[in-house]
């Protein structure tokens, strides 16, 4: 069995908007009150960085709306159903499992408080990501198949030809991660 803790977060405690953030607070309270415990961080020692085979160019035009944008390309991925343990972890916090790639980004977001988004890297025209606004009324179809008209204030994540995502809000149908996806572009950004 497991425990479910509901936490009300005040605006000054964004650091507690994740499982790890809440765990740090609980750890601090336990230590301060004389309990012996430890907090373990996952090891990243086996993660190898090599972007020579699948490079992407990133350009942030709208720097006020996006002070920081990072992307990581992953090749040879197999998109499939997530393991049952991951699906269960997502369901218990009110998220719907989609596939292993999308699910792990949602899991990391809830665990560490860093929103992530993944694109089918082969659908990123020109191997270029541009963070910018688009003209008023630009049509955009979201992952759920609904067409929206963008405002000239909406921040968009674009490839060399078109919008792929409304920044921090909703991904686009044309660049989503599906069963046919083999290469993934993983986004981690800070949007105002």
Question: For the regions a protein language model found, what residue spans apply to each?
Answer:
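RNA/tRNA-interacting regions in translation and RNA-turnover enzymes
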Residues: 1-192
């Amino acid at each position: 069995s497991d425990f479910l803790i509901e936490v009300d977060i005040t605006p000054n405690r964004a650091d507690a908007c994740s499982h790890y953030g809440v765990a740090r607070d609980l750890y601090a309270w336990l230590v301060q009150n004389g309990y012996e415990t430890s907090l373990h961080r996952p090891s990243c020692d086996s993660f190898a960085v090599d972007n020579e085979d699948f490079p992407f160019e990133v350009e942030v035009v709208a720097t006020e709306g996006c002070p920081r944008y990072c992307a990581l390309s992953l090749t040879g991925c197999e998109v499939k159903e997530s393991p049952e343990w991951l699906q269960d972890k997502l369901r218990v916090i009110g998220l719907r499992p989609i596939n292993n790639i999308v699910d792990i980004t949602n899991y990391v977001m809830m665990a560490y408080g860093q929103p992530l988004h993944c694109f089918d890297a082969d659908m990123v025209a020109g191997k270029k990501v541009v963070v910018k606004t688009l003209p008023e009324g630009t049509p955009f179809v979201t992952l759920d198949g609904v067409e929206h008209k963008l405002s000239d204030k909406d921040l968009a994540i674009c490839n060399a030809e078109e919008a792929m995502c409304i920044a921090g809000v909703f991904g686009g149908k044309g660049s989503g991660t599906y069963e046919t996806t083999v290469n993934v572009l993983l986004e981690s950004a800070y949007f105002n």
